[in-house]
Each structure stands twice: as structure tokens, then as C-alpha cells.
Amino acid sequence: MRTFQLFGLAAVALFALSATALAQGDTTKGKAAFAKCGLCHQVGPGAKTLGGPELNGVVGRKAASVANYSMYSAGMKKLGEQGFVWDEQNLDKWIADPKAMIPDSPMALAFPGIPDAGERADIIAYLKTIPAQ
């Protein structure tokens, strides 16, 4: 019984630490790391849709909701219809492995994901600084 209690406590601590690490990304590093995303996504004033939608204000935005982007996959549209929102945790999962979330997404086919949790946290921290336009 004691082993299970210790395991449970360790699991809670690990979850708390991972959430803290996610929230504490470095925006400067994130801006540099976003170059990988910039092949398909733009941010900032005048951002356009390229291979993927522009990402202004993406944190907190409903999935598949950029009006002038027409290449959403069926899976992404379904998420949007279900009210799925791009919060930090969902963005982290998506950037880590798009194919695991939505196999039919163009991003899942073209981008393998970023395995490094710190780099993902940095990108998300940077995206949080970009307001909707």
C-alpha cells in the first residue's frame, strides 16, 4: 500500500513539474525555433495562410477556425466542430506528434513533430505573445 501511495505522489509531482515546464518556455528561443514552423505558418501583422493557417492568436483559438484557410483536414474540422481549443497542453501534444492526433492532417503528413519538450514549450511561449490580428 505504501508503494502505491509513493507512486501516486510521484506521478502528481511529475505532472505538476511538466505543466510548470510547459508554462515557462523562453519566448526568445521560441521565436528562433518557430523558424521550423515558418515554412508553412506566418505570424504577426500581415500574416497570410501558406501551407498552413496563420497562427496569430492561436493559443485559446478553436481548431479549424481561420476563415481564409481552406485546407483543413476532415479530422481537424471535426475537432473544431467539437469545440476543441488550442490551449498550451493541446498545442504541446500537436507539435510533439501531429500524426498521433490527426493522421489525415497535411501537417501530420509533412511534419514529423518536435520531440524536445523544452523546444515545444519555447514555441508555445512565443505563440502566446502573438495576439489575434
Specify the residue positions occupied by each region the protein language model found:
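Thiol/disulfide oxidoreductase modules built on the thioredoxin-like
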Residues: P103, A108-I114
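Periplasmic/extracellular electron-transfer cofactor-ligation site
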Residues: G25-V85, K93-P103, T129-Q133
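Bacterial N-terminal signal peptides that target proteins for export
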Residues: M1-A11
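Charged catalytic carboxylate motif
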Residues: K29, N90, E119-D122
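Short, exposed beta-strand-loop hairpins at the edges of beta-sheets
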Residues: P112-I130
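Sec/Tat signal peptide C-region and signal peptidase I cleavage site
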Residues: L17-A23
